[in-house]
Regions:
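Flexible glycine/proline-enriched surface loops and loop-helix/loop-strand junctions
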Residues: 72, 120-122, 205-212, 219-228, ...
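Short helix/loop capping segments that flank catalytic or ligand/cofactor-binding pockets
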Residues: 11, 86-87, 98-102, 107, ...
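Short active-site loop/helix that positions an aromatic residue
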Residues: 96-109, 225, 234-248
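Substrate-recognition/specificity elements adjacent to catalytic centers across diverse enzyme folds
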Residues: 1-89, 94-100, 118-119, 127
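Hydrophobic alpha-helical segments
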Residues: 122, 148, 249-348
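N-terminal leader/propeptide and maturation segments of large enzyme subunits in energy/redox metabolism
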Residues: 13-41, 47, 208, 212-213, ...
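Ordered core of a single globular domain
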Residues: 220-221, 230, 235-241, 246-248, ...
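Compact, glycine/acidic-enriched structural inserts
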Residues: 57, 113-188, 229-233, 334
Length: 365
């Protein structure tokens, strides 16, 4: 959904209206300095006229009725040294709105080699977001990663084909004729233009301009059943991390605990490798300056396994500090929910935390 690109549309329009980057910087602030970060600094890692933007911004706003504004959640895990049982605990709650029909349904899948319970999405087998089996459990929050880019493209018509400009040369664009079947209505014919950045979703290439969207989910997509099955069969946190290797979209945070005493935080999904400039606005697709260079390697995504502080908290706040070597995103939620969870956890008597305590913290949010 386009809600991930709405901040870029807003900043692009402000840049046009306010007349420059300095004016924009006074209006749009980044993540507040000193606010809580999921994976703190010091963690080691391996490794022109913009036609169509106004209509795209309007379309994104109209799409909000589908419920995408209700994203966000809380999740945390704590070390066994802080619990009455001596084993780690994990807690998570979804901030979904009251959907009808509901987006989540609780399922319990039990068969030889599999015993898992959690939240499933209708039409998709397995439980991936909030779930546990006999050995490992996890809670999910939205990762707020910037995985969509908007590319303003230059087009021309000629020689019986449509072309777009890239690095001073003209390339053939792919043009598809699609038919949308409408129940109880007439079919709708649609021409779709595709560049190497992605499909054009705004503007009119015949006029010379269009806006293409780049999104990891537009490629081979997410093999959800494969990831869900591997996750439900995982026996510990490391196996769960491996299960998420094939996950593409959306990018999520996971608070995790297992029966071997491991706890912590995992980030899962495909995040394009590119500069932070892509995150601020719609970019010029014809220059070659804003290209993707693959995806952040799965083993180098933000991760905290058995952190020394004894807990891991993810409440949609920034996931990695400035020393993280890759650009992840700009639009994170301020720390306030995460800081409240942290305070409540630290108020608990060390070595005495229970499931009931976790439930009370949920009720405090």
């Amino acid at each position: 959904m386009l809600f991930r690109s709405e901040p870029k549309l807003l900043r692009t329009r402000l840049l046009q209206k306010e007349g420059g980057a300095e004016a924009l910087a006074r209006i749009v602030k980044g993540y507040p300095a000193g606010h809580l970060i999921t994976v703190p600094p010091g963690a080691e890692y391996k490794g022109a006229p913009l036609d169509g933007l106004s209509e795209l911004q309007e379309a994104a706003g109209e799409a909000n009725w589908l419920g995408e504004t209700d994203v966000g959640s809380n999740a945390w895990s704590i070390a066994g040294s802080r619990t009455a049982s001596g084993l780690p605990l994990v807690a998570g709650d979804s901030h979904r709105g009251l959907d009808a029909p509901s987006v989540y349904y609780q399922v319990h899948l039990s068969c030889p080699g599999l015993n898992a319970i959690g939240s499933s999405v209708p039409g998709v087998p397995g439980a991936l977001h909030f779930a546990h089996n006999d050995r490992v459990g996890w809670g999910m929050t939205y990762g707020s990663a910037d995985t969509q880019d908007l590319f303003v493209e230059r087009f021309r018509e000629g020689s019986g084909r449509r072309e777009y400009e890239f690095e001073g040369a003209w390339r053939p664009a792919e043009v598809l004729d699609e038919t949308i079947r409408v129940r109880d209505g007439a079919e709708v014919a649609m021409e779709v233009t595709i560049t190497h950045h992605g499909p054009v979703i705004a503007g009119d290439p015949r006029s010379g301009w269009g806006v293409a969207i780049g999104d990891p989910g537009l490629g081979k997509g997410t093999p959800w059943p494969d990831a869900a099955l591997a996750a439900m069969k995982a026996s510990n946190m490391l196996e769960l991390r491996e299960a998420f290797r094939t996950w593409t979209d959306r990018v999520n945070n996971y608070a995790v605990a297992d029966c071997e005493g491991n706890f912590g935080y995992l980030h899962a999904g495909k995040i394009p490798v590119r500069g932070q400039a892509n995150g601020w606005r719609a970019v010029e697709g014809w220059t070659g300056r804003f290209e993707w260079e693959g995806y952040i390697p799965h083993d180098e995504l933000p991760t905290a396994i058995n952190p020394e502080v004894g807990y891991a908290i993810t409440c949609n706040q920034r996931v990695a500090a400035h020393d993280y070597p890759y650009y992840v995103g700009l639009n994170f939620t301020p720390e306030f929910r995460a800081r409240r969870v942290q305070r409540r956890l630290l108020d608990l008597e060390s070595g005495a935390a229970t499931v009931a305590d976790m439930a009370r913290i949920h009720g405090d949010m």
